[in-house]
């Protein structure tokens, strides 16, 4: 019995440690750290939906609000966006200031309409629904509404462990990640909260609206950008 007790205690400690790790660095990254996959340069190639979202007018919000109110607003935004991603099975990789980088891995890239693409679209709808509910409460409290833009793209990425020998980080890198960020950067100028790449648009049955071709920094050819259907 003493041996069983020690085994159960060790298991409980591992579960607790894994839960804390996953809270800070994500579900998959936390599992990899617990499994000892922490060498710099470890990684794998994936095909995935890439989600990049950003809080609108965050600099003005930060300047206009006391620190505690601004942090509260940030957390409301993250609850809406990251909460929706996680609820729909995505992996939140980073909070970059007020931006969220996440992925929905695609197991079978050769499929014409991967399920992960429709799942990501559902997560977008959920995120805006959550934000709408939060904004109702913010209006009732006399606070300004929050808004955000999001881009959906798909492509090959490298998911790996990078950094220095004393500070490592799990992240995704590759041209597709940069392109997703550039697409999201068009949300404000195009006055459209959700922008979608052609590669993603070709992967879903939803009738998306073409917004024409647009230049993306670091990308040679103008890219066709799509938006959700008008309600």
Regions found by a protein language model. Name each.
Residues 75-89, 106, 110-150, 175-186:
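Alpha-helical scaffold within the catalytic cores of cyclic-nucleotide enzymes
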Residues 50, 100, 148-154, 225:
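A structural signal for short, well-ordered beta-strand segments
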Residues 157, 180, 186-231:
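Cytosolic regulatory/linker segments at or just downstream of nucleotide-handling modules
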Residues 103-115, 150-170, 187-190:
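Catalytic strand-loop-helix junctions within cyclic-nucleotide turnover domains
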Residues 1-45:
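Regulatory cytosolic signal-relay segments
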């Amino acid at each position: 019995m003493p041996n069983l007790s020690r085994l159960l205690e060790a298991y409980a400690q591992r579960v607790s440690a894994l839960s804390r790790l996953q809270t800070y660095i994500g579900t998959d990254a936390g599992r990899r750290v617990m499994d000892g996959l922490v060498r710099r340069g470890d990684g794998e190639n994936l095909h995935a939906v890439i989600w990049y979202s950003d809080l609108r007018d965050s600099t003005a919000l930060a300047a206009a609000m006391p620190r505690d109110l601004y942090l509260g607003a940030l957390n409301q935004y993250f609850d809406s966006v990251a909460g929706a991603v996680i609820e729909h099975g995505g992996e939140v990789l980073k909070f970059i200031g007020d931006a969220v980088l996440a992925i929905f891995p695609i197991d079978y890239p050769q499929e014409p309409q991967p399920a992960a693409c429709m799942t990501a679209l559902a997560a977008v709808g959920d995120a805006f629904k959550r934000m709408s509910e939060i904004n109702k409460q913010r209006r009732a409290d006399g606070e300004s509404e929050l808004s955000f833009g999001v881009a959906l793209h798909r492509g090959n990425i490298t998911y790996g462990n990078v950094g220095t020998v004393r500070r490592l980080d799990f992240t995704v890198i590759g041209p597709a990640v940069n392109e997703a960020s550039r697409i999201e950067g068009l949300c404000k100028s195009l006055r459209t909260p959700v922008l979608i790449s052609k590669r993603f648009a070709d992967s879903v049955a939803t009738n998306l609206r073409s917004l024409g071709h647009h230049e993306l920094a670091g990308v040679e050819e103008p890219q066709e950008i799509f938006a959700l259907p008008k309600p």
